[in-house]
Amino acid sequence: MARFAPDATYLSYRDVTPEALTAAGIHALILDIDNTLASYEQAEPDEAVRAWLGALTEAGVRVGFLSNNHGERVTLFNKTLGLPVLFDAHKPLLKNARRMMAALNATPSETAFLGDQIFTDIWTAHRVGARGFLVPPIKDKTDLFTRFKRRLEKGILRRYYKKNPDAPDVRPERRQKGASV
C-alpha cells in the first residue's frame, strides 16, 4: 500500500511553500487543477492561486499542470498563467507524467505531484519515482465513480494516519467534525 500513501498531506495547496519545497530538494511541482486548486465550476484561477504560483516560480520552482480534464477547461484555466500544461493526461498512466517532467526539465527525485486523489495524483507520482502530496478536495464531487474511489481512499488514509499521527488530516469527515490539525 505504500505506493498509494501520500508522502505528505496539506490542508490546502497554499500550505505547500516554496521554502519547504526547496528545503526538501524539490525543484519541480506538477499540479492537478480540479478540486486541488479550484472547484470544477471555477473557470479561471483566483487571486490566491495566482499569488501562490507566482511565489513558487519566483523562488525558482518549475510548475506545470497535469490534468485528466479536457483541453478547453484546462486551457482556459491556464490562459493568464502561461504554464506548461498537459490535459487528457489519463493519470495514473505514465506517458504524460513523464512528458510533463521532461517539459519542466526535472528528474523524479526533484519532482513532486500535488493533487486531491490518491488513485490518480499520488499513484502517478510514485509510479514515476516522484513524491506525492495530497490535499483535501475543495468540493465533494458526488458522481458514483468518485464516491467509490473516495471510499477506497479512506482505508489507505486510515493506515497513513496510524503511521503519521501528526500529519495534517485531509479526510473530509475529520475536517468537518473539527478535528485539530
Question: PLM features: what roles do these ranges have?
Answer:
Residues 1-31, 38, 42-43, 48-113, ...:
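Asp-based, Mg2+/Mn2+-dependent phosphohydrolase catalytic module
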